[in-house]
């Protein structure tokens, strides 16, 4: 059985009250799907902006984005690519 995988970027905005410890725990849970991540501090607005590139099934991407959005002081949105990749599960 093949699994559909998608590439997406999850944009995360962390305000000064953001729970960064919990954010990192959640990202670590999904580490097997994360291709890369980049964080940028925006001092003028007192926020941090993180972009996470992920290659995973759509339900995994949605679950991660949803969990991140429920954290205190954190907003997130997922942007999906149009390309799909079908892979066979590992034995």
Regions found by a protein language model. Name each.
Residues 28-31, 35, 69, 73:
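Signal for well-folded cores of large energy- and translation-related assemblies
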Residues 4-14:
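Short glycine-/aliphatic-rich beta-strand segments at the starts of folded cytosolic domains
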Residues 16-17, 54-59:
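Helix N-cap motif at beta-to-alpha junctions
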Residues 35-51:
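Amphipathic, hydrophobic secondary-structure cores in small proteins
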Residues 36-38, 72-83:
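Conserved short beta-strand edge segments in small beta-sheet-based binding/regulatory domains
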Residues 23-27, 63-70:
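Short amphipathic alpha-helices in soluble, non-transmembrane regions
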Residues 86-91:
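Conserved small/polar residues in nucleotide/adenosyl-binding loops
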Residues 17-33:
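Short amphipathic alpha-helix segments
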């Amino acid at each position: 059985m093949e699994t559909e995988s998608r590439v997406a970027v999850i944009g995360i905005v962390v305000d000064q009250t953001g729970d960064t410890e919990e954010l990192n725990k959640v990202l670590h849970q999904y580490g097997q799907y994360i291709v890369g991540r980049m964080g940028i501090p925006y001092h003028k607005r007192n926020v941090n902006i993180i972009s996470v590139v992920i290659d995973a099934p759509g339900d995994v991407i949605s679950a991660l984005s949803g969990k991140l959005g429920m954290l205190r002081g954190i907003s997130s949105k997922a942007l999906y690519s149009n390309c799909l990749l079908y892979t066979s599960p590992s034995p």
